[in-house]
Amino acid sequence: MIQVLLVTLCLAVFPYQGSSIILESGNVNDYEVVYPRKVTALPKGAIQPKNPCCDAATCKLTPGSQCAEGLCCDQCKFIKAGKICRRARGDNPDYRCTGQSGDCPRKHFYA
């Protein structure tokens, strides 16, 4: 049961991109023991679809993509400059997309 939990957590965090996932099913609810280099069945919902912005074989952006993830990335393109990506909290201002990156600017801490 612990092995199933670990494999399920791993698959939920790291999308299935190729044949490197290691799992073989016996007959117990499609979960079973981990065996090297063979995939026969996976729990429903354990595999996330691959990111269309990334080429899994090269680990690079697909042609025409500007970004693959981030609060300022939408459908593989940078979000326009000025869009709020993180609301103000306390004394910190709203953080806005720059239009040059898929990442929301980092929080600034003042002494």
From Swiss-Prot:
The modification Pyrrolidone carboxylic acid is found at Q48. Belongs to the disintegrin family. Dimeric disintegrin subfamily. Expressed by the venom gland. It comes from Agkistrodon contortrix contortrix. It is found in: Secreted. The keyword Zinc-finger does not apply. This is Disintegrin acostatin-alpha. Inhibits fibrinogen interaction with platelets. Acts by binding to alpha-IIb/beta-3 (ITGA2B/ITGB3) on the platelet surface and inhibits ADP-induced platelet aggregation in human platelet-rich plasma. GO terms for cellular component: extracellular region; plasma membrane. Keywords: Cell adhesion impairing toxin, Disulfide bond, Hemostasis impairing toxin, Platelet aggregation inhibiting toxin, Pyrrolidone carboxylic acid, Secreted, Signal, Toxin. Disulfide bonds join C53-C76, C67-C73, C72-C97, C85-C104. Pfam families: Disintegrin. GO terms for molecular function: toxin activity. Residues 47-111 form the Disintegrin domain. InterPro entries: Disintegrin_CS, Disintegrin_dom, Disintegrin_dom_sf. Heterodimer with subunit beta; disulfide-linked. One of its GO terms (biological process) is negative regulation of blood coagulation. The lineage of its organism: Eukaryota, Metazoa, Chordata, Craniata, Vertebrata. A motif (Cell attachment site) lies at residues 89-91. Residues 1-20 form the signal peptide. Residues 21-46, 110-111 form a propeptide.
